[in-house]
UniProtKB/Swiss-Prot annotation:
One Pfam family matching this protein: APH
Name by which UniProt lists this protein: Thiamine kinase
EC identifiers of the protein: 2.7.1.89
Organism (species): Escherichia coli O157:H7
Biological role stated in the UniProt entry: Catalyzes the ATP-dependent phosphorylation of thiamine to thiamine phosphate. Is involved in thiamine salvage.
Secretion signal span: none
Amino acid sequence: MPFRSNNPITRDELLSRFFPQFHPVTTFNSGLSGGSFLIEHQGQRFVVRQPHDPDAPQSAFLRQYRALSQLPACIAPKPHLYLRDWMVVDYLPGEVKTYLPDTNELAGLLYYLHQQPRFGWRITLLPLLELYWQQSDPARRTVGWLRMLKRLRKAREPRPLRLSPLHMDVHAGNLVHSASGLKLIDWEYAGDGDIALELAAVWVENTEQHRQLVNDYATRAKIYPAQLWRQVRRWFPWLLMLKAGWFEYRWRQTGDQQFIRLADDTWRQLLIKQ
């Protein structure tokens, strides 16, 4: 149920107006990019979410609601309410583990997602790379960063192998191991893009695991594994730049030292992979 209002409301106003019988259960972190809180009434639970990035346009939050509205409940939480700065979605019971599931199981989930109707908006990385450069701490901007940005701008993004709806933030913390199978949460970066971009963006433990995931996916998608892996590798510089830039952006936004450490580590990976 979308509810349009130009005036933001407080948490207490949200609960009293739309969920008067529900009460907050606990507050929990949803990964690096923000938090949510849980509400409950007679065993029914919802997650109340706010935009992770307070500086992001409201349209980005609305896109997340629209993506969840069209996705099947077997892979994503169903949304119940959207209004400015707030979204209420189903709570997905299950276990969130600290490591990825079996690569074949994960490949099956991603392949099923990629068979769904497209969302209707494209993921384009270059505008994000440029935004993160512009919004980063000037003292952290380097000649090497600018050189790499110009190189990618000139090269342009790889031509999609297959265009599908993507989650774009697949890591252990966003996977719920439920009784009915794997499900994905935290869809803030969802959009249409290359299936190889999704596979390249998965937060894997090592190259061997990455190759196995790509091979398992290729079997399901009836693509030559070597062809798919080549396409995945084409996205690596883009994704490493995206991660590094995002960490730099979040460092300036929050002052949290963990983002500097993550940025420095990603810059080192980028130099290795060049």
